[in-house]
Amino acid sequence: MAGQKIRIRLKAYDHEAIDASARKIVETVVRTGASVVGPVPLPTEKNVYCVIRSPHKYKDSREHFEMRTHKRLIDILDPTPKTVDALMRIDLPASVDVNIQ
């Protein structure tokens, strides 16, 4: 697989879970002998939702909730078959969304 590249994008709401998952992926790739670039922190997506506190009136009294989506990018350069096999077997938390390209 010379000259190839695997790009892994991680998304999660919890920054500690995504950092631990990225660290685990990098350790696995380095242990199998491939070179790795990253984890590169991508911009955090912030969604703000405005909700009226009262069920009937008092529109001036509002509450804001936000959801932050943290993202990381990891590039694996010149992966070996051993690297791909190790990545398939790695156990990551369910709260982390993994997209492999």
Swiss-Prot record:
Pfam family, one: Ribosomal_S10
GO molecular function, a single term: tRNA binding
Signal peptide: none
Gene3D superfamilies: Ribosomal protein S10 domain
Protein's gene: rpsJ
UniProtKB keywords: Ribonucleoprotein, Ribosomal protein
GO cellular component term of the entry, any: ribosome
Family: Belongs to the universal ribosomal protein uS10 family.
InterPro entries in alphabetical order: Ribosomal_uS10 (IPR001848), Ribosomal_uS10_CS (IPR018268), Ribosomal_uS10_dom (IPR027486), Ribosomal_uS10_dom_sf (IPR036838)
Origin species: Mycolicibacterium paratuberculosis (strain ATCC BAA-968 / K-10) (Mycobacterium paratuberculosis)
Protein known as: Small ribosomal subunit protein uS10
Task performed by this protein: Involved in the binding of tRNA to the ribosomes.
Keyword Transit peptide: no
Entry-linked PANTHER family: 30S RIBOSOMAL PROTEIN S10 FAMILY MEMBER
A biological process from GO: translation
Keyword Ribonucleoprotein: yes
Assembly: Part of the 30S ribosomal subunit.
